[in-house]
Amino acid sequence: MTTNGILQILAFTAIIWALAKPIGGFMAKVFAGERTWLHRILRPVEVAIYKLCGVDEAAEQRWTGYAGSLLAFSLVSLLFTYLIQRVQQWLPLNPQGLANVAADLGWNTAASFTTNTNWQAYTPETTMSYITQMIALATHNFFSAAAGIAVAIAFVRGFSRHSANTLGNFWVDFTRATLYILLPMSLLAALFFCSQGVIQNLDPYTKVTTLEGAVQTIPQGPVASQEAIKMLGTNGGGFFNANSAHPYENPTPLANLAQMVLIFLIPAGLTYTFGKMIKDTRQGWALLAAMTVLFLAGVCVVYPAEQAGNPVITRLGVAGGNMEGKEVRFGIANSALFTVVTTDASCGAVNNVHDSLTPLGGLVPLVNIELGEVVFGGVGSGLYGMLLFAILAVFIAGLMVGRTPEYLGKKIEQKEVKMVMLSVLVLALCILGFSAAGIGQQTVANSMTNHGPHGLTEVLYGYTSAAGNNGSAFAGLSANTMYLNTTLGIAMLCGRFLMLIPLLAAAGSLAQKKLVPVSAGTFPTHGPLFVTLLVGVVVIVGALTFFPALSLGPIVEHFLMHQGRLWS
C-alpha cells in the first residue's frame, strides 16, 4: 500500500462522516412532514400528486397495508419494465433500431430493476434503446430506491412509536423520498458529472475512423442523468457495458470520488435520520461506527491483496501489483476502494473487473454482499438490515445475562426474533440453494469461462449478487441463458421481498409495544461495547453461514495460487 492511497481512503471516510449529519437531518425533516428549504417549490407538486393519485396524506397504514402497497407498486413496476423492453423496437428514441428484448432477458431485467439490483445479463449499448433506458430503467432507479427508503422509515417508526397500530403511509413516504431527496440530489449530481465530461445527448451512435484505418462505432446517449441516480440510489446498472470504467460514465478521478460519495451518502445519512426520529442521535452514530469498522476492514484486505498482486506473475519479474482489469487513471487504491464501496452498499457499479481480482480481493466483495448488504448497504436496505442485526445483538446480550432483551425501550420478544431470523435466513437459503442447484446444471457449466474454484466462485457470486440485490458480477459467467435469466430473476425477487415482509411485520409488532423505562440493568446500545457486539454478530451470523462455500471457492484458490496452480 502507498501513503497516497491510504490518505485517499481516509479522506473519503472523513467526507462520508461529515455529510451524514446534514443529509440525515434533512431527511428526518422530510419524513416528519416539516418545512424544508425545498418546501416552497415542491410542496405544491407533492399535493398535486396526492390529488391526482387519490392518496389521503393523513391516512396511515398498518404493516399489512404498508406491505401490500409496496408489493402492488412493485408488481406494476415489474410488468411496466417488462412491457417496454418487449415493444422497444416500435417506440421512438431508438436511433440504432435495436430489436425487442427476448422474453427471458426481459423478465430478468424487469426483476433486476424493480428490486434495485440492476443485474445486467446484456450489453446495454446493443440491447436497450434510449427510451427503454430512460422510462423503464432510469425511472425504476428512482422508484426502487424510494421504496427502500420508505421501508426503512417505516421500520424506524416501529421504534419511535409506542402503543400504535400504524407505520405511516407507503405512498406518502415513497413520494417524499422521490420528490425531496432523490430528484434534487440527482439533478445536482448530473450537472456535476456533465462538467466532468459525462455525456448527455440523444444522438445516434458516432462512427469514426481510427488511426489504423478501421471504422469504430462510439455509443452515445443520456448518460449523466442516469449516472447520477445509478449511484445515489445504489442501483449500479451501467449505461454502458463497462459501467463506471467507461470514460463516458466516469471520466476523471474527481468524478470517481463523487460517485463513491453518492453511493454512501444516503445510507450514511439515514443512520442520523434514525437517531433524530428516535430522539437519540447517539444510537445512529453507533450504527454508523459499526458500518465504518466493517467497511475499513474490507478495504484493508482488498487493497494490500491487489497491491501484492499474483505471486505467479511476480516470479516472472513483473512487479506493480495486480493491474489486470483496472483502469490506469484510477490505479489500485481507487479500484480497491470502489470495489469495497459498491459491494458494501447494494450498488453493484464497478470501475474495474471483479473477476480479475486476486482470490482474497474477490473474497471481500463476495462476503460484503453475503453479510446482507448492511455495511452502509443500499438506500434504506442498509439501515433496516443493520437494525435487524442490532435486534439480534441485544437478544444475544440479553440471553447472556438472563434478562429480557430490550432495544430502544422496546422489549424484544419471540415474535420479533422469529421475524428477524426469517429475514436473515432468506438470504442464505436463496444464495446457497440456487447456487447448489445451478452448479449441477450443464447449462450453467457451459456458461462458466473458468473452471475449478474460480468457476465455482463465479456461480456463487452471481446468485449472491442477485439475492443480495447488488448487481455486480464476476463477468466470466455468461449469464444470458434461459436458465440463469429465470433463476437469477427469482432470486432477486426472493432476496428483496421475502426479507421485507417479515421486517415490516416486526416493525408493526414493535410499534404496538409500550416503552420500557431505562433501568440500571438496561444494556446501553450507543457505546463501544455495543458497536463491538454488533460487528461480531454481523460477522458471525452473516459470514460464517457461507464459510464452507467460500472455502471451496476463493479461499482454496488463494492457497493454490501461492503454489503456482492456476485455472483457466
From Swiss-Prot:
GO CC, alphabetical: plasma membrane
Primary localisation category: membrane
GO molecular function: P-type potassium transmembrane transporter activity; potassium ion binding
Domain of life: Bacteria
Residues spanning the membrane: 6-26, 64-84, 135-155, 179-199, 254-274, 285-305, 382-402, 419-439, 459-481, 488-508, 529-549
Keywords: Cell inner membrane, Cell membrane, Ion transport, Membrane, Potassium, Potassium transport, Transmembrane, Transmembrane helix, Transport
Topology of this chain in the membrane: Multi-pass membrane protein
UniProt-listed Pfam families: KdpA
Location(s) in or outside the cell: Cell inner membrane
Alphabetical list of InterPro entries matching this protein: KdpA (IPR004623)
Quaternary structure note: The system is composed of three essential subunits: KdpA, KdpB and KdpC.
NCBIfam families for the chain: kdpA
Family as reported in the entry's similarity comment: Belongs to the KdpA family.
Protein task: Part of the high-affinity ATP-driven potassium transport (or Kdp) system, which catalyzes the hydrolysis of ATP coupled with the electrogenic transport of potassium into the cytoplasm. This subunit binds the periplasmic potassium ions and delivers the ions to the membrane domain of KdpB through an intramembrane tunnel.
Protein name listed in UniProt: Potassium-transporting ATPase potassium-binding subunit
Lineage: Bacteria, Pseudomonadati, Acidobacteriota, Terriglobia, Bryobacterales
